[in-house]
Amino acid sequence: GQAMLQKIITGRWLQANAVVGLYPANRVGDDDIALYADEARTTPVLTWYGLRQQATREAEDDGSYRPNRCLADYVAPAQNATDIEADSADESRARGQKSLQDYVGVFAVTTGLGVNKKEAQFLAAHDDYNAILLKALADRLAEAFAECLHHKVRTDLWGYAAGEQLSPDDLIREKYRGIRPAPGYPACPDHSVKRDLFALLQCDEIGMTLTESLAMAPAASVSGFYIGHPNATYFNVGRIGDDQLQDMAQRRGMAEADLRRLLAPNL
């Protein structure tokens, strides 16, 4: 592995590209997050529709219950929890209501540019082992790049943890503030938001695209969101009921049958 990694570096076999955006953002309703074009917070550039856990909870020792979580819980509400859908932006401004100033980041990274060409050379030489090793290392480099960029965002670009000083072990254990949930993972299992994310970031300009099945190309790529809330942690949405499916279909303005196909693993 180390020998192959050195060849990748010295031979410049792979190219790494990334794009990141930081946007004013607020929770809309209970479960959704709106990313806005500017600080006026009136023009959404992306709406991230959220799913909430629906598990039946057992009481804790003190009689309390753990909440059923949604990623939107970690973003400040629009208009200080007034109903953004019921009020126009002009009416809200007239009453002096302002949304809390929160933000959400979006990112996409790839280290897979060049993999296909080199893999084809290995396969032409019947060297399946190195073809597999190359792809595996490219995948690991993509994860490392995502970690490196997240650190840059926390300490500089967004800067909410400018004084962060963590050891490599602490970084691996994710002891930093904030999370970077990726579409398709347990906390946000809906892959379809990748379409809006890729369009917003213009990922095609850095060589990243989506397949019809919403897989990223090159394969050695990572994309997702940044949430900076100090209490934000990862969780598994798990199974949801038809009531939540129907509610999301209405919010998204899409056919329930189409959404059912997208969320089949969680139904």
Pin down the residues of each PLM region:
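Generic structural signal for hydrophobic core residues of well-folded globular domains
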Residues: 110-111, 145, 252
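Acidic, metal/cofactor-coordinating or nucleic-acid-engaging core segments within structured domains
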Residues: 137-139, 143-152
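Long alpha-helical repeat solenoid scaffolds
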Residues: 133, 263-266
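Short hydrophobic alpha-helical segments enriched in small aliphatic residues
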Residues: 89-91
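Compositionally biased, low-complexity/repeat regions
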Residues: 17-30, 36, 44, 49, ...
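Active-site loops and adjacent core secondary-structure elements that bind or stabilize anionic groups
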Residues: 1-87, 96-131, 136, 155-157, ...
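Alpha-helix initiation and N-capping motif
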Residues: 1-2, 100, 115-116, 146, ...
